[in-house]
A protein has these predicted regions:
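Helix-adjacent hinge/juxtasegments
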Residues: 27-62
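RNase H-like nuclease fold core
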Residues: 1-16
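Zinc-dependent deaminase
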Residues: 40, 53-126
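Conserved protein kinase catalytic domain
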Residues: 8, 27-30, 70, 116
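A short, polar/charged loop-to-alpha-helix boundary motif
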Residues: 14-28
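Structural motif
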Residues: 6, 46, 68-69
Length: 126
């Protein structure tokens, strides 16, 4: 979302579908937004995600210089902000941005649980 509130890109995880370990929604959304703006720096842009980003995605956000990150559910297993070593707090990083997490945590957690339960059910049918 840009500084005027316009949605620049939307995405979802295509890691399994495309057999691409980098096919996370955040990476795809950042890439598309940068293309639309014709600029890799997304300083005045905000990123909204359902689940706390993994270290790879948080690294991409730092590289893209995003303005603000908003996320719903925390991910204690793989979330880059919930891990014991939160590299985001490392003072050596060249960019920092506000992170607002836990937004509608219950709803986001429920949405993700339902989504993955359905995927497992469909996978077991095949």
């Amino acid at each position: 979302v840009d500084s005027r509130g316009m949605i620049l890109s939307r995405s979802h995880n295509i890691k399994e579908k495309n057999h691409n370990p980098c096919g996370h929604a955040e990476i795809l959304a950042i890439t598309e937004a940068a293309k639309k703006l014709n600029n890799w720096r997304l300083l005045d842009c905000s990123l909204y995600v359902t689940l706390e980003p993994c270290p790879m995605c948080l690294s991409a956000m730092i590289q893209a210089r995003i303005g603000t990150l908003y996320f719903g559910a925390y991910d204690p297993k793989g979330g880059s902000l919930s891990l014991n070593y939160n590299f985001y707090k490392d003072q050596k990083l060249n960019h920092a941005f506000p992170v607002i997490g836990g937004l509608r945590h219950f709803e986001c957690s429920k949405l993700l649980s339902s989504f993955f339960r359905e995927k497992r059910t469909n996978y077991n049918k095949n």
